[in-house]
Amino acid sequence: MESFDVVFPLNFGLPAALPANRAIAEAALRASRTQNIPVFYAPLGIFELGDYPPRICADFNGYISTVKQVRALVETARQRAWRRVLIIAAPPHRWRALRDVRAAGFEAEVDDSLRALPRGLWYARESEHRQTTSWFRWWFTWELPARLMIYACRQCYERRASR
């Protein structure tokens, strides 16, 4: 897929000032400028994009999960007739991000530009999302259990991630 309707960055931990989220935001801006398409993200404040004009935001309350972000994308995409999504996600998050966006009915690809960054960039002790504070916590307390849940019961995964 060469052309897309929207760039969809997904955070990796909180706050927006984490090195991981700054790298994701920069990649989203580059992709938006290169493709001449808008950036969509949710919730508000998850990324610092300055006053970059072709951006669209949605908001929701509570825990920030990939499932909630994809649901916000679905709602906005219906209004704007978006079908093709370029995902910007941290390499450890790529598989599930792509799976969740495709499961919502989109044609999607993940931008490869972030794969060249060092693995240590993605994990930060100061992250408000405990699972992104270390490689071990991400894989063994979060990502692998999430993948098992997806395979065992997709609806269970979505229900849990929607809280």
Locate each region found by the language model.
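A structural signal for short, hydrophobic/glycine-enriched beta-strand patches
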Residues: M1-W135
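Glycine-rich flexible loop motifs, especially short His-Gly-Gly/GGXG/HXGH segments used as catalytic or interaction
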Residues: R125-R163
